[in-house]
Swiss-Prot record:
This is Small ribosomal subunit protein uS2. Residues 226-245 are annotated as: Disordered. PROSITE patterns: RIBOSOMAL_S2_1, RIBOSOMAL_S2_2. InterPro entries: Ribosomal_uS2, Ribosomal_uS2_bac/mit/plastid, Ribosomal_uS2_CS, Ribosomal_uS2_flav_dom_sf. GO terms for biological process: translation. Keywords: Ribonucleoprotein, Ribosomal protein.
Amino acid sequence: MAAPTVTMQQLIEAGSHFGHQTHRWNPRMKPYIFGARNGVHIIDLSQTVPLMARALDFVHATANAGGKVLFVGTKRQAQEPIAEAARSSGQHFVNHRWLGGMLTNWQTISKSIKELKSLEEQLSGETHGLTKKEVLNLTRKRDKLELSLGGIRDMGGVPDVMVVIDANKEDLAIKEANVLGIPVVGILDTNVDPSGIAFPVPGNDDAARAVRLYCDAFAQAASKNGGGANVGEMENPPVEATADA
């Protein structure tokens, strides 16, 4: 099946064209800016549509070839959509805090994942012989590891592509991917540096509805059985939200 599509109309309705205030821009985003309105940069969606299609095609081809897709979005608006995108497509995610070395020091991260699974096994079985305080401490340790590593617990190695919401906030993740030669798909607002992004997709990265649109599209692309659908035809369309200029 073909990769999913995102239309100009869907991007407009989601507020994807609203960038940040003009004084907050990154000059390297100039090629993707249409102009300014009321002190806010307007993103050129005539570029976003084909660039989004290119990124979706790449993610779709990677997933179909058995590749691993890692979704990264730790800002508040992205946390839930990112996790849902990964779970619905059978892929992987980081939506809490990027731990230094998550990719470049995978061996250590793997040990922490093993510890998480061991704690889960221990707590799911008989815990008599342990005091209430010991059980509480083990539970807290498990919960902390789950928050950081739960989304990559079954990744089994570094991913084949990374999809990022907000290149500024996830700069450490992008740097690690660049070091390892992992291609990065990035939603780029007008205040970010597009360097290191193999598949740039200019668009608002703050409005909840826009973030949901991107995540839904990439979730379909990353699903081995998905693709081919128009994202706007979903049964539960994203809820409207105001763009944060």
